[in-house]
Amino acid sequence: MAELTEKDKAIQTAMGQIERQFGKGSIMKLGAREIQAVPIISTGSLALDKALGVGGFPRGRVIEIYGPESSGKTTLALHAVAEAQRQGGIAAFIDAEHALDVAYARRLGVNCDELLVSQPDTGEQALEIVDMLVRSGAVDIIIVDSVAALVPRAEIEGDMGDSHMGLQARLMSQALRKLTATIGKTHTTLIFINQIRMKIGVVYGNPETTTGGNALKFYASVRIEIRKATAIKDGENILGNRTKVKVVKNKLAPPFKSIEFDLMYGEGISKTGELLDMGVDMGIVDKSGAWYSYDGERIGQGRQNAKVFFTDNPEIFNQIQARVREALGLSSPTPKENGKEKGKAKP
């Protein structure tokens, strides 16, 4: 064994002092512990799981989902809640907008009987509740809907015409400073839903911005933009929207990946439509003209008919889904794989 240099001895002494003062594990060499795969919660969309690069929403991170009104922000978040619950996780929904549709959430697969819901009166109250849930170490995913509805107490108690410049931005900045370290220890996925506003006087460039200041942009490990693309029609009836999702920021994989899926009214993300598109892209499902085929057998003429075939034949749907997941390197998540150690974070 090589003799330690003065520099090595000095760093070992410093590390020893740090561990005695702040606890074991407060500092270590990165190579001293095995690098583990990032634990995730599926987004509910195979295409988005692939675009995120790690197989879903990472645990122990802050995530922002933003976009125009009625673009599918809450729907995407509720799909993630349903996936977390399927893995045996506990989910919480901070309904700052007081607009959670329980019947719709159930249709998306959310177990509403087990969902923790809070409808806070002020932004401070909402973020304190989030902090307490995170520190419990028992909650797997928390949705805050939305940042724009986190109104500071001073604004609620003040008069209608009063100016409250920067109050919400300061509130978000302070909360995120507290929350970021804690969620890393408890492996809680914290998703903020945000709205879009327009900057005044912008001539060049994009005038759009999100509410709540810049803190969330910095602290978020993943930022997702969601927008309507085109309407999905059956004759004159609009059944849903083709929706475009872009990963604007990603600290865990290359960003700027874009995907599209069908967002159907009353149903959420169309699993059949998404699987059909991915199956064709991967060569698992054959497309010739308007006809779709699988294993040499025709499954439908036109996209809508092929989607209906998948709905009527779940065994074929499951076969194709298994092949797509295998091709993507995505295993079916289980509580054991993605489970986290339950324990209280240090106050």
Curated annotation (Swiss-Prot):
The gene is recA. The keyword DNA-binding applies. It is found in: Cytoplasm. One of its GO terms (cellular component) is cytosol. Belongs to the RecA family. Residues 337-347 have a biased composition (Basic and acidic residues). It comes from Desulforapulum autotrophicum (strain ATCC 43914 / DSM 3382 / VKM B-1955 / HRM2) (Desulfobacterium autotrophicum). This is Protein RecA. The keyword Calcium does not apply.
